[in-house]
Amino acid sequence: MPINITMPALSPTMEEGNLAKWLVKEGDKVKSGDVIAEIETDKATMEVEAVDEGTVAKIVVPAGTEGVKVNALIAVLAAEGEDVATAAKGGNGAAGAVPAPKPKETAETAPAAAPAPAAAPAPQAAAPASPAPADGEGKRIFSSPLARRLAKEAGIDLSAIAGSGPHGRVVKKDVETAVSGGAAKPAGAPAAAPAPATLAKGMSEDAVLKLFEPGSYELVPHDGMRKTIAKRLVESKQTIPHFYVSVDCELDALMALRAQLNAAAPEKDGKPVYKLSVNDMVIKALALALRDVPDANVSWTDQNMVKHKHADVGVAVSIPGGLITPIVRQAELKSLSAISNEMKDLGKRAKERKLKPEEYQGGTTAVSNMGMMGVKDFAAVVNPPHATILAVGAGEDRVVVRNKEMVIANVMTVTLSTDHRCVDGALGAELLAAFKRYIENPMGMLV
């Protein structure tokens, strides 16, 4: 029976992607773990691995196709011992499960003079591609199409099977092992998914365009990244009650320590092994502040308060067309030099769209620094599942009062945005006070 290859969900939030490149062609033999394609998501370009063995019988979605929905049929494999031509014909029946998206237009693509007539439907030789199953809590279970079919035939629950495929995906051999061992519980009806929250809509495009003279503008289609940013920020502002706390931090001691540490950096191949930035020290200070104020290192769910054991700090990085937030994991445990070198690597690969999902998804807090752009102060939008985000302004000379005398100091304004459901004003102020202590007494970050 043909094995359907469907558009994989490369992250829990992925809904669609662009099929950038096929690394196999029809007739090629593949085995589990072989890289077969490259998929562009809204944040990165990622490799897709085969999760079943077989021969590529038919490529359904051509390279360069945009907006391919998760679970849409993209190719058909002939199983071991199966006739490739027969498998290719059988795969046609599943192609109707999802409308085929249009290939990405190029300069060489000429518009069609007239729409082609619809092809007659092929005999249904294979079942339509089914959506990925979910466990009792509605969470997606990552599995191959063949594994889903075998599990259904055997009457076992995929959520009871530990996947051994790429990224924990349940594959054929996992189901066969479960069947022979009798370990999997009988499949039950999945719990009904809760109805999604209704979000308010803004002005329609027609309403907006009516306000401007024809010819005074051009329309630039939204790409996947911009759509995702818009969706998540609207959801954040409509579902998270934001609360803001600001404080001024003096930077003179931090700048002096930074210069001293950079001057003392050992060299390798004629280059210093690290070069600390102010932002590196901000990341460390926030991580230590969360360690000291653990009640602020949380995430909100409708059932529980998720208290995190480590400070995983996301750092907003501007990239063409939007931004991405790579994460420094367990930043409270890392040295300043380790944080600095890790951020340089993450930032470089972020701009190249080469980050893996686990490098930018999750985290427990975030830093958004616009100080290098001369911005004095601003407030950032909380990015769930975070409960906090720190907006960092520029350091500048200001007049401050010490011992009843006016002196000049290098001062930076920071604003903490919090999810008021789990971080109240007093708790936010406590976290910000701890951050300020580390910034103004930076030797504490070295011990």
UniProtKB/Swiss-Prot annotation:
Region annotation Disordered: where it falls in the sequence: 91-140
Residues annotated as domain Peripheral subunit-binding (PSBD): 142-179
Post-translational modification N6-lipoyllysine, affected residues: K43
GO cellular component, one term: pyruvate dehydrogenase complex
Segments of skewed composition (Low complexity): 108-134
Keywords (A to Z) from UniProt: Acyltransferase, Lipoyl, Transferase
GO biological process: pyruvate decarboxylation to acetyl-CoA
UniProt-recorded Gene Ontology molecular function terms: dihydrolipoyllysine-residue acetyltransferase activity
EC number: 2.3.1.12
PROSITE patterns xrefs: BIOTINYL_LIPOYL, LIPOYL, PSBD
Catalytic activity: N(6)-[(R)-dihydrolipoyl]-L-lysyl-[protein] + acetyl-CoA = N(6)-[(R)-S(8)-acetyldihydrolipoyl]-L-lysyl-[protein] + CoA
Xref: InterPro entries: 2-oxoA_DH_lipoyl-BS, 2-oxoacid_DH_actylTfrase, Biotin_lipoyl, CAT-like_dom_sf, E2/Pdx1, E3-bd_dom_sf, LAT1, PSBD
Cofactor note: Binds 1 lipoyl cofactor covalently.
UniProt keyword Transmembrane, yes or no: no
Active site positions: H420
Lipoyl-binding domain location: 2-78
CDD domains in the cross-refs: lipoyl_domain
Enzyme class: transferase
The protein's role, per its UniProt record: The pyruvate dehydrogenase complex catalyzes the overall conversion of pyruvate to acetyl-CoA and CO(2). It contains multiple copies of three enzymatic components: pyruvate dehydrogenase (E1), dihydrolipoamide acetyltransferase (E2) and lipoamide dehydrogenase (E3).
Quaternary structure (record): Forms a 24-polypeptide structural core with octahedral symmetry.
Protein's UniProt name: Dihydrolipoyllysine-residue acetyltransferase component of pyruvate dehydrogenase complex
